[in-house]
Amino acid sequence: MKLTQPLADVYCKEQKTALEAQRLAQEISFAPMVFQVSRLMVKFGILEYLSNNHKGVTQTEIVEYTKLSNYAVQVLLEASLSIGTVITSDDKFFISKAGWFLLNDPMAKAN
């Protein structure tokens, strides 16, 4: 493949450290789980509920709102914390910036 020099500088040699490459490989391998959890957080209205409650909500409040089991909500919240779409403080959960964009960005919604 013939590449212009700026593209060759990027695509013809390794750009990542071993640690960065390992992190990327893990992100790729977890992508289906990240997608499914995020999709369910939108489908069940949890991200929207968090977005509308700026003072945060407890896990119990989310269970009451969604009518999902406590375990289901716990799994979704814990995964969302790792994904980065939710943050927590003082036993309350809040939507993160990434969660807000997932909920509101037209391109994120389309994909």
Q: What do the PLM-derived regions correspond to, one by one?
A:
Residues M1-N111:
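N-terminal accessory segments
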